[in-house]
Amino acid sequence: MKRHIELNNEIMIKKDGRFQFEKDEEAVRAYFIDYVNQNTVFFHDLKEKLDYLRDNDYYETDFLDAYTFEEIKAVYKTTYAAKFRFPSFMSAFKFYNDYALKTNDRKKILERYEDRIACCALYFGKGDGAKAIEFAKLMIRQEYQPATPTFLNAGRKRRGEMVSCFLLEVNDSLNDISRAIDISMQLSKSGGGVSLNLSKIRAKGESIKDVAGATKGVVGVMKLLDNAFRYADQMGQRQGAGAAYLNVFHADINDFLDTKKISADEDVRVKTLSIGVVVPDKFIELAREDRPAYVFYPHTVYKAYGTHLDEMDIGAMYDELVNNPAVRKERINPRQLLEKMAVLRSESGYPYMMFQDNVNREHALNHISRVKFSNLCSEVLQASTVSEYTDYGEPDDIGLDISCNLGSLNIANVMAGGSIENAVKLAVDALTVVSESTNIKNAPAVAKANREMRSIGLGAMNLHGYLAQNGVAYESEEARDFANVFFATVNYWTLVRSNELAQETGSTFEGYEGSKYASGEYFEIYFEGDYRPKTDKVRALFKDIVIPTPLEWEVLRDNVNMHGLYHAYRLAIAPNGSISYVQSATASVMPIMERIEERTYGNSKTYYPMPGLSPQNWFFYKEAYDMDMFKVVDMIATIQQHVDQGISFTLFLKDTMTTRDLNRIDLYAHHKGIKTLYYARTKDTGQEGCLSCAV
């Protein structure tokens, strides 16, 4: 066994009744001595290195040519002067295994962590040497982390896109379906995750050109997509990933769910495609009242009304659809369907759930479109309009699909840095550069939306880590107080920066005029309420940090009314599971799954203690499976008030829970205004062992 693996494993060998957390730092040092230093290509100086990387097609040239060599050198000097050290073996291993640039045979390392940060900073700086240094400082302090596609690809010659995720509307014709599959493969090849709204597609047994029973339904399309994503990956570096969403009132809903049953036939089962169900309030109402529900055949709805089922306000239209004899429908028991979804989620983790009316009550751009579906991780929630792809030689009618480039603030390091304003504004600028430099020609509706909407998705990580290291329990009132203040402040500074960019460029996103931002409605909660700390503990945490007052929110509203916003969407909290290891941060805003994670790589086991874990804060690092999920819902609901898009909300379940227990959590989440529920993870309590006594 390699020395760094041995040292890492010694964490678990108790000494004086305690885990040896200090062994992880020794493992990092050994990893650098035995692997990183031995396998890093040596260059005499920076110029030789950059010349080699450009001449051998590792780095793009244009972004570097925008600077003088002295400016480039200053950025690299900034990152190396920070004397950054990985605090855990897992963080170092994750970076050098997954993110560092390597030679074409992948045997030698061409970038250290400082080099990757410098490269990203120069890319974001767009020729402004001083701004590039600011980006470098922000990222080497680990206050901001670009999402994996951006961090992996920025500045590289042979790369995928830097945008993290894409959402495609699918219209109801073979042209549209085949084009959606083609675009999905192109986007997957570029490193993005792709979700598709299948709610417009005819259900199984509907008519084609008045021939009854001719259609095959959504499952056949899902099978094609499943194979497409497995085939199209990013040069073997990143697997293709896709998701399909369906409205719960679509007649194929049961067949759709059956694709994830463990016992499903191979002709039906989708192996890698994720699935999500869009749930309007009306369905929840029918289930609560134990009334029968009707699901509808979407083509008959379109023929009767000229509007697609998923674009209707089901709450307003449901009774009319039920009573219209021209609309084909089928009676179901909504409670049984909720139970079926609960069983599936305990078995497979799917489906995701999007509470459509919770989303659209808060959505600021309903005048463009209601939100009809979400993305692969259920945090991107935007307006979209469907395209119509015609035969060759005829013009296509290009709508608005969705793209969102993501990045995350490391809460602990932002708080330590003392300026939420500085971190947020620079993060918004970095995300904006990626948005503006992205033009995906193979996906015309994505490219159009990116040009017009300029959507970004700033998120966060390390919430549980920060709380635990400051002696605050995740389920406590103080934790919710902290989250309320922090995310209200982040929201404020994203709006300020978007407003500043609108003033600097003289440009707003397409459709700003009809939005809740333009009317001022969006801002009302902030000057009607006070989002400053309410508990002594949280007041102390924010002691030296500027928090906006209700009066400052009113001033911001007036500035936005006068000059507009540059971005249609600003905030989205992704799960950021992989990249959080590089940051030595707890993932997203969710509680931890384990105090000490065990990972297997090849024939070796490695251990990852949570950031800053010690005997003193052990019990503040309470594991998610031991938490009251209703309190976790309360936390996410608190944060959701301040996030214009969504939060990737993972449910943590024990195998002793019943479907009734899960349905109670779902209904409580819906009641609290949660927008989406992501993957459901179930823990096998039969294998449970208690580590608490070994602290």
PLM features: what roles do these ranges have?
Residues M1-V695:
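Extended catalytic cores of very large enzyme megasubunits
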